[in-house]
Amino acid sequence: MATHSALTTLSNDLADAVAAAAPSVVQVHGRRRPASGVVYQQDVVVTSARALGREDGLQVRRSDGTAFDAELAGWDPATGLAVLRVAGLGTNPVEVSSTAPRVGNLGIGIARSWSNNLTA
C-alpha cells in the first residue's frame, strides 16, 4: 500500500507541475507546422531553432489562442535553441529552479499540439 500511495503522490505532484507550467507554454509558428516554446522571461520565448525555418513572419500563440508577432533575437547552433522577442505577450515566465538537475532525475516534456492543446 505504501508504494501505491507514493506513486499516487508522485503522479499528483507531476500533474501539479504541468498545470503550473502550462500557461507559460506557447505555440511557435515559423514553418508549416507549429512548434512549442516556453516563456522564459517577460516577452521572451525560448524554442527549438529547427522549428523556425525562417527569420521573418514568426508568430507566437498563447494558450488562449491569441497570436503575437515575434522577432528572432538570436539562436545557438550548439544547443539548437532560439530566442524570440514577443512584445506585449503578457504571459508570466515559467518558474525555473535554482537547483541543477542530476542525471537520473525525472523530467517532463510539455508542449502545445497542432490544435494548441496542452500535451505532456
Predicted regions and their residues:
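PAS-family sensory domains
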Residues: 16-17
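Conserved active-site neighborhood of the chymotrypsin/trypsin-like protease fold
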Residues: 2-6, 22, 30-119
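Long, charged, low-complexity terminal extensions
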Residues: 10-11
